[in-house]
Amino acid sequence: MFAARVGRSAPSIGFVRRLTCLTGIGNPEPQYANTRHNAGLVMLDLLRQRLDSGGSHSYKVCMNAPAKYCHVSPDLLLIRSDGDYINLSGKTVVPLWKRLPHRDAVTHIVVHDELSLPLGKVQLRKPGTSLRGHNGLRSLRSHWGSDGFHRLAIGIGRPHERDPQVVSDYVLSRFDGQEMSILATQSLEKALEKLQSLL
């Protein structure tokens, strides 16, 4: 169903429509909803609300993967990887990427949390740049066979201590109301600004 739906978006013979695929990665929800590690999913939902102003396009469940997808337009596909752990993102997402028609005409942008950026900051990095130790991005690279995807890094800040357990507890903690408000305003506006050249 996923491939067929995407296929219907492709125009007729002689012209290949370019597709932008925004993929948000995170841990299973609702268990980890609104945690810092799921900032990529939070931002994907905010982007969908803004880009689909009429609210007429909702997520559909993938039949063969723990993920959801949404066609905001014939040129823009959103994939929400929310059914398996973020460190296994490649296992979930890449089979869906491989089912897209005209793969060479697809621009992939992965939306993810970023410890090295403070909350409210967003960075768009080109394919081939550092993965900065993000295990979800590493998994995508491993399963895709390359790092040929853009990364939209959503800042979540970093705890003062660098102890691995402290960092783990931090990324699995939930955003409070004020932090969610920052994501929905400052972070969202910066994300839209960064994505202008690709959407």
Language-model regions: role of each:
Residues 1-2:
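Universal eukaryotic N-terminal targeting presequences
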Residues 165-174:
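Acyl/amide activation-and-transfer machinery of modular secondary-metabolite enzymes
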